[in-house]
Design a protein with these regions (language model features):
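Transmembrane alpha-helical segments that form the membrane-embedded catalytic/substrate-channel core
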Residues: 95-107, 136-140, 193-208, 262-305
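Multipass alpha-helical transmembrane domains of eukaryotic endomembrane proteins
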Residues: 211-235, 277-320, 331
């Protein structure tokens, strides 16, 4: 909680974060052995289920749309028919956006080889599913694998990498608008709408040491090795086919029809992808490490489990978790072992939480995934310090809400953060 002293200096009481001192064996052995088993048949059943849901939601929407007419329903004003159709298709795009996010998650499991025991099946299914959702499968699979190997590492992580104090440019417009409620809201909206493609095209929020122009479509990009070249080209072919299919559909059915049937749910998928991953890896409670203090277990525990749509009530929280296959609710276990399939991740999560509690570590569970939470986190997480091997996000005033505590009970400071610019 922030306080203003009589000298008009802002202070904040910091939450202690016990820096994990567990080994990889400690984490993996906490999870029951059967949780690591992968089944192609079971995983494929979820693909079929999601595709069936997409079809059913579409057919139900078309059926309802045909009955929003004077011969079926009477409205006092003709404009209400247009409004009702708009509301119906808006609901359709939201629902199929959630289901589409579930398909995205299954393709993501293919990239982790968690879909089945067969690498050929995994990469084939993953390429088709991700290409259909506008994702360069192998390109993203490679950088995402690096993200898992170095989560929370200041110079090796691949996405949601914090700016340092020196990198946080404070222009006049930013000073005037950036940290105001309206400025933060506009930033969050643009991030959710375009953040995914800006990451793919120009490495937005990615590793800061990569050169300008780094992107996921160039075979010779910095984050790829020479032997990745053919895989990147195969990914690019998938994107070219996807763009061609969208253009053909627009030519055949018209832009409006393609927009409401495919593009709006597609934008919702991108929205959920950005919202969920941002909140998994960004919070004032989570540390970031520089090389001297980084270990894989510490990196794996630099994430939070959250409930998608949990802030909208219990039923919506269940739907959010169910339709997105628990990607947000079981994310810590996913980082401990990314080969655990989603249907086993729930049990793995329960077992892992018990082990972390035994080690005296704080529960890695955050507030539900939602716009309000992203707004809060966006304002609280502006930059980290240029120095220090364990750093936490600070807000625009330069205040951190969390401080590191080690197993020997030592702390890095008094636990009171001062606004040094006050």
């Amino acid at each position: 909680m922030a306080k203003v002293s009589p000298q008009k200096r802002t202070t904040v009481e910091q939450t202690p974060f016990v820096v994990p001192d567990l080994t990889v064996k400690d984490l993996l052995s906490a999870i029951p052995a059967h949780c690591y088993k992968r089944s192609a048949v079971r995983s494929m059943s979820y693909v079929v289920y999601d595709l069936f849901l997409l079809y059913c939601i579409y057919k139900a929407t078309v059926f309802a749309d045909a009955r929003i007419a004077p011969e079926h329903i009477s409205f006092p004003n003709p404009h209400l028919y247009t409004f009702a159709r708009f509301a119906l298709w808006a609901l359709y795009s939201f629902a199929n956006g959630l289901v589409g996010t579930g398909l995205w998650v299954l393709a993501h499991e293919c990239g982790h080889q968690a879909f089945s025991e067969s690498k050929t099946i995994n990469n084939t299914v993953g390429w088709f599913l991700h290409s259909a959702l506008g994702v360069p499968y192998h390109s993203w699979r490679i950088t995402h694998g690096k993200h898992h190997a170095s989560t929370g590492h200041m110079t090796e992580d691949q996405v949601h990498v914090p700016k340092t104090r020196a990198q946080e440019v404070k222009q006049e417009l930013y000073d005037a608008l950036g940290d105001t409620p309206i400025g933060a809201s506009l930033s969050v909206a643009s991030y959710l709408l375009a953040g995914w493609w800006f990451y793919l095209i120009k490495n937005a929020s990615g590793q800061k040491r990569y050169p300008k122009g780094t992107n996921h479509f160039a075979p010779d990009a910095t984050m790829f090795a020479p032997h990745h070249r053919d895989q990147i080209l195969i990914s690019d072919v998938g994107i070219a086919l996807w763009l061609g299919a969208v253009c053909w559909a627009v030519y055949t059915y018209g832009f409006f029809e393609v927009f409401r049937v495919y593009l709006m749910p597609y934008l919702w998928v991108n929205h959920w992808l950005v919202l969920i991953t941002f909140l998994q890896h960004t919070d004032p409670l989570l540390p970031h490490y520089r090389a001297p203090e980084f270990t894989f277990p510490r990196g794996a525990l630099t994430t939070l489990d959250r409930n998608t749509l949990g802030d909208c009530g219990r039923i919506m929280g269940w739907l959010g978790a169910h339709l997105t296959h628990g990607i947000s609710e079981t994310h810590v276990a996913h980082h401990v072992s990314s080969k655990i399939p989603h249907y086993n991740a729930w049990e793995a999560t329960d077992a892992l939480r018990k082990r972390l509690a035994q080690a005296g570590l704080m529960p890695l569970q955050g507030a539900p995934v939602g716009w309000a939470e992203m707004y809060r986190v966006f304002r609280a997480c502006k930059f980290v310090e240029d120095e220090g091997d364990i750093v936490f996000y600070k807000d625009a005033r330069g205040l951190a809400q969390t401080r590191p505590v080690f197993n020997d009970s030592s702390v890095s400071d008094s636990g009171i953060e001062l606004d040094k610019d006050a």
